[in-house]
Every structure is written in structure tokens, then in C-alpha cells.
Design a protein with these regions (language model features):
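Extracellular carbohydrate-recognition regions
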Residues: 21-53, 176, 276, 573, ...
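Beta-rich accessory regions
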Residues: 179-196, 201-212, 237, 243-249, ...
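Extracellular glycan-recognition surfaces and repeat-rich motifs
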Residues: 40-74
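Conserved small/polar residues in nucleotide/adenosyl-binding loops
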Residues: 374, 627-629
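Hydrophobic core segments of beta-strands in well-ordered, beta-rich domains
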Residues: 101-103, 152-154, 195-196, 245-246, ...
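Extracellular carbohydrate recognition and processing domains
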Residues: 117-165, 178, 196, 210-239
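Short beta-strands within extracellular/lumenal beta-sheet-rich domains
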Residues: 72-99, 136-138, 177-187
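Surface loop/turn signatures of beta-propeller and other carbohydrate-active proteins
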Residues: 24-28, 125-128, 133, 176-178, ...
Length: 629
């Protein structure tokens, strides 16, 4: 998953959000420490460039997309973006109440970006954000330090994505600052729970409970007005049980949650795939945001496309695995979400393999098992912000329709903070599973396992010019049929070719970027594909669909072939031949003569077409073919 890239997309997407000014309503006996409403930081001590020279104004906050703060200003280390570093120290004050209350937001990193409380020069409390720009309540119990000298310290020593901390309205009180919760109870009567979404509304944390068990949690733009669109959560497994839906209490939240209802089909189902900006050929999700393709696998006649999905909004977040299948790589059927955020974090990118030898030991009745290996993204999500990234597995016994998460997760603990995106393949000569994993700063690691549960590191290397979303596969060389080579790719399609003995990858080429555009990212290829085909799909990360109930799209499937050339080996990428299945009526114009005042025009009643042209530049003769899709 994409801390570096997605923060840019997030900023671009949320800038239209409605800012919500929180009135903290201090009690008469509360003691204000600072709410940063002045033009300067006053007697606070500044170090570095992260916090600028003054509190950040409401106008700048609105541009950034911050949508919950107190008053007109706050302290933020995002003044110079993620790259800024620095420290902001308050003047000394005396502890005179039981609690120090404040608002906090920004990145989650207890080591490098946080708010701390010092007592007599020694740190005694520390809090961090949770990778959200929305400010949340925080409260420190300081009763044991009554009467002692204290100092608040804001620290930002991170230059990575989400490398900033926001804070506002520090005050002392004998009352703990806590969110007031509104709860809606409802009986599950049908297959889907319908949830209203208001674009640009404040993003609220929404938790769904059955009894004392939280079964789902998500961040949703909940507004009190008429919703812009509806999203759904499949609740068929809970029919007959009572749900308790909780979110921060406000008139808008109450109005939105009271609109939630159950139905046998999704609300607005009649509008699916009919929106004016909906791509006609590229895969898009019915509702919500998508990014990385995940778990690309062919199994029993179906091409499975799992993908990073926000089922509850058109901005990045709530990372869940969506699922679609195709029998021909041209027509896709969306099946719904399969892996949801859990106690280890949101579900970031990964891969799916066919466990033909039942190495995981989950096979039943002879049915082949599909196993997903993915990143549990601790550090993201309100309830898992205190965790770090780890690698987990899940399995399916019914062709990917339903999944069970492994009870022993994670199967690979944290190595570095944002290690992620495991790609797994079977290595026949050693009879073991191989995992490639992104670590940090263009560095990757290779692991092996006999059973998908127990992993041993065997190699580390760097891919200059790329990071995250690794892929690793063996291919025949087209013009040297007896030769097979291993190919390693990074997210932006930069690749290396070399040899692999099951333990170490030895490169034989320099890094080459296969796709030079800016709309082809998080590249992944299919495992277990028939006829030894190597089919690749990418996230088209340069697209955007304003005011639509969906966002982002996938590339066409491409077929890769490996070729020997004078300088070594190169990959060739072409759209799969199956796209011809989309073609309809064909229009051909030949021997066209193009003149400055004689432009060729025609009317075609078609929403999409494939254009093929040929030009003879010297004679300005042209041929034009249009094929209806």
C-alpha cells in the first residue's frame, strides 16, 4: 500500500471537504494551556522547519483538507509537507487539574511523530495520530503529577508519507475529554445494510457491533442532508441479529445513521454502471474507491481480480479486498468484498495462490484451496493505529467466494514499519513457497516456506527507481525457447531479469521501466495461468471521476513476453487478444486525403470504440478504422 503516493491522491481528493469547527466548550474551572489562536506561537520554543513560524490558519487548513479543528488556527508540522522536521515546546506550566485534554491528528509513529508531556524535564506521556487528517480527542490522566512543572512537546522527525503531527486546544480539566457516541440499533432482516454517503462531509468513525463484538468498522462521510449516493455492507450472515451502529454524536450523524436500512438488493442497484463518467471497458467497482490489483490468480476457468477497495467512499481508506471474476479477460462480474479490516489492521495488498499440494492443511473433500497472503496494515485505522504492518493469510474453499482468516495471523511479524505487499509463488525445484516483500526505500526481501505459515528470509536486494508492490515470476524466452529467466518488477513497472535458485535472486540486467507513462501503477501478474501465459494488470492511478459514486479504474489486461536482445533481456507488453471479444460493428474509411480546410468528420452512435489509423505522411494519405465496442 501506498503511503507516498496515496497521501498525494488523498490531498487532491479531500480538498473540497467541509471544515468542521469544534467548539471545545471549556468549563469555568478548566485551565486553557494554548489554543493557538494568535498570530504567533508566543513563548513556545521552535526548532527546525516543520511547524513554520506561526499556527496554521483556517484558510490553509481547508486547502489541506483538514476537516475538524477548534477555532481558527492550530499547530501543524505539515507546513513544509512530509519532509519538514522539527520540535515545538510549550512554556512551563503547573499541573492543577486531573486531565490534560487536546485534539490530535496526523501520522502514526510513536517514535518520530507525536505529542509528549514532560514533567520536571522527563517525558511521562506520549500520543500519536493514526494516519488521518481529522482531529480526534485525546486525554492524559495526570493526577499523580499534581503541582509539578510540566511542558508539552510536539515532535516531528519523520520525512516519510504521513510524516506530520497536528494538535490543537490544550487545556487542563477535572473532566476527561471523550467523544459522545450516538448508537442506532436495528434488526438485520435482509442481505444488505444500506448506508448514505455525503461527499465532502466530515469523515466519521463508524463501528458496527453485535453484542460485545465489533464486526465491522469504517470511516464514512456522514452528512445530514440528502445523500449523494448509497453504499452497502453485506450482512446476510447476521440476519435475525441486532446491530448496534455507533459514531460520534452530532445532528448530521444522527440523521445519517437513522437513514440506514436493510434490503434484499442494494439501494440504487438500478443505477450501477450507468453513470455518465463510467468507463465502458476498463474495470471499475460499483461503488467506492479502488487502487492496487491484488491476488491475481486463474482457477478452474476463472480469472480472479481482487483489488484494494474502499467500499464506503470515493477517497482512499477502509482498505478491503474487493473481488471480480472473468472467464475471458474482457467481461468482468463483480462479486463483492471478501477480506475486511480486522484486529490487525486494514487489508493492504497481497497475492493469492492455488495450494495444490494442500501445504496449509485446510483442504476439505478434495476441493482445491485458494490462499491469500496479504499485509495487515497496523498503523492505519482508528482501532489499529497503535500496531505496525505484518503479513497474514486467509483461505477459501469455494473458489474465492468466501474466506476464512487464519487464526495464527500474522504469519510474518513486522520487519520494518511499512513492510508490505507480499507476492507468493511456488518454486518447483525446491518444493517450497517463495515470498517477495517490500521493506523500505527500494529494498525488498525474499522468503521461503514449506507451508505458507513459517517463513525464512533468504535474500535482500534493491530495485533502483521503484518501490512497493513486488512481483516475481519465471518466464520462457520467446526467441530462446529452452531458456527460462526470472523477472522481478516493482510498482511502477520497473523490472530486473535474472536467475533464481530458490534462495537468492541474481540479476543479469539493469533496471528498465516497462511503461513510461504515469497512469500504470501497482503492476501484478496472474499466477497459475493456463498455457504458461503471463498476464498483467495495473491500477490506472492517473484517473479521477469527479462527483461520481466510484473512483479509479484498472488497466486492460496485458500479455507479457520475454525476449533476448543484444543488451540482454527485455519484456514486451501487449493488450490481450481477448479484448477483440468486445468489438462490434466495424467502420473503415480508406484513401482519405487530409487538407487544411478539408477535415474528415462523421457521426457514430457508440459510447466507445477502438481506433486504428495509418498515415502516409509524404502524400498526406490516410486510412481510418473505427470498431464499435
Amino acid at each position: 500500500m501506498k503511503e507516498r503516493i496515496l497521501i498525494l491522491l488523498l490531498l487532491a481528493t479531500v480538498c473540497s471537504m467541509q471544515a468542521q469547527n469544534i467548539h471545545m466548550a471549556l468549563r469555568p474551572d478548566d485551565l486553557l494551556i494554548d489554543n493557538f489562536e494568535g498570530d504567533t506561537f508566543g513563548n513556545w520554543i521552535l526548532e527546525g522547519n516543520a511547524f513554520g513560524n506561526s499556527p496554521v490558519s483556517m484558510e490553509r487548513l481547508s486547502i489541506w483538507g483538514d476537516n475538524r479543528f477548534e477555532g481558527n488556527r492550530m499547530a501543524s508540522s505539515f507546513v513544509n509537507g512530509d519532509a519538514g522536521t522539527g520540535v515545538l515546546k510549550s512554556p512551563l506550566f503547573r499541573i492543577e487539574r486531573r486531565y490534560v485534554n487536546f485534539l490530535i491528528g496526523g501520522g502514526v509513529d510513536y517514535q518520530r511523530e507525536y505529542v509528549a508531556l514532560w514533567i520536571d524535564g522527563k517525558e511521562v506521556k506520549r500520543s500519536t495520530g493514526y494516519n488521518r487528517r481529522v482531529m480526534e480527542y485525546e486525554s492524559w490522566d495526570v493526577a499523580e503529577y499534581m503541582g509539578k512543572n510540566a511542558r508539552i512537546v510536539l515532535v516531528d522527525q519523520s520525512k516519510e508519507g504521513w510524516g506530520f503531527i497536528n494538535a490543537d486546544c490544550f487545556y487542563q480539566s477535572d473532566t476527561k475529554l471523550e467523544k459522545e457516541i450516538f448508537a442506532k440499533r436495528m434488526l438485520v432482516t435482509h442481505r444488505y445494510l444500506n448506508i448514505p454517503v455525503k461527499m465532502g462531509a466530515v469523515i466519521e468513525q463508524m463501528d458496527i457491533w453485535i453484542g460485545d463484538k465489533m464486526v465491522r468498522n469504517m470511516e464514512v462521510e456522514l452528512g445530514g442532508d440528502e445523500p449523494d449516493y448509497w453504499v452497502t455492507l453485506e450482512v446476510k450472515d447476521w440476519i435475525g441479529q441486532e446491530l448496534r451502529i455507533e459514531a460520534s454524536k452530532s445532528p448530521n450523524v444522527e440523521q445519517a445513521l437513522n437513514q440506514c436500512f436493510c434490503s434484499e438488493t442494494p439501494k440504487e442497484e438500478n443505477l450501477f454502471y450507468k453513470e455518465p463518467l463510467r468507463p465502458k471497458v476498463h474495470f471499475t467497482s460499483r461503488r467506492g474507491w479502488l487502487n492496487d490489483p491484488n491476488g491475481l490468480v486463474w482457477h478452474e476457468g476463472e480469472w480472479h481480480l481482487f483489488y484494494q477497495h474502499n467500499p464506503y467512499g470515493c477517497i482512499w481508506g477502509n482498505m478491503t479486498w474487493g473481488h471480480a471474476v472473468s472467464r475471458d479477460l474482457a467481461h468482468w462480474t463483480e462479486l463483492g468484498d471478501v477480506l475486511h479490516p480486522d484486529s490487525l489492521g486494514p487489508i493492504f495488498s497481497g497475492s493469492v495462490v492455488v495450494d495444490k499440494k494442500n501445504t496449509l492443511g485446510c483442504q476439505q473433500n478434495g476441493d482445491t484451496v485458494l490462499v491469500a497472503v496479504y499485509t495487515s496494515a497496523g498503523g492505519f485505522g482508528y482501532h489499529t493505529r497503535h500496531l505496525q504492518h505484518s503479513q497474514s493469510i486467509g483461505y477459501s474453499l469455494d473458489k474465492g467466494r468466501n474466506w476464512v482468516t487464519f487464526s495464527g495471523n500474522p504469519v510474518l511479524p513486522t520487519l520494518v514499519r511499512y513492510n508490505r505487499d507480499p507476492k507468493v509463488t511456488w518454486h518447483t525445484p525446491t518444493g517450497r513457497w517463495i515470498m517477495v516483500l517490500y521493506l523500505d526505500k527500494q529494498e525488498y526481501a525474499i522468503f521461503s516456506s514449506p507451508n505458507l505459515m513459517d517463513w525464512t528470509e533468504t535474500d535482500r536486494f534493491k530495485l533502483e527507481g521503484a518501490d512497493e508492490c513486488p512481483d516475481f515470476f519465471e518466464m520462457s524466452v520467446t526467441n530462446e525457447p529452452t531458456v527460462r529467466k526470472w523477472v522481478f518488477t516493482g510498482a511502477n513497472s520497473t523490472y530486473l531479469v535474472g536467475s533464481f535458485d530458490g534462495y537468492r535472486f541474481r540479476t543479469e540486467t539493469k533496471p528498465v521501466k516497462m511503461d513510461s507513462g504515469t497512469n500504470y501503477y501497482a503492476v501484478q501478474t496472474y499466477s497459475n495461468a493456463p498455457d504458461d501465459r503471463r498476464i498483467q494488470i495495473a491500477w490506472m492511478n492517473g484517473s479521477n471521476f469527479p462527483d461520481m459514486p466510484f473512483n479509479q479504474q484498472m488497466s486492460f489486461p496485458r500479455e507479457l513476453t520475454l525476449h533476448r536482445v543484444d543488451k540482454g533481456y527485455v519484456l514486451k507488453s501487449m493488450p490481450v487478444n481477448e479484448l477483440a471479444l468486445l468489438y462490434g460493428r466495424k467502420y473503415i474509411w480508406k484513401s482519405l486525403v487530409v487538407e487544411e480546410k478539408n477535415c474528415f468528420t462523421t457521426k457514430l452512435n457508440t459510447p466507445a470504440f477502438y481506433l486504428k489509423t495509418g498515415f502516409a505522411v509524404d502524400s498526406v494519405d490516410a486510412q481510418l478504422s473505427l470498431i464499435h465496442i
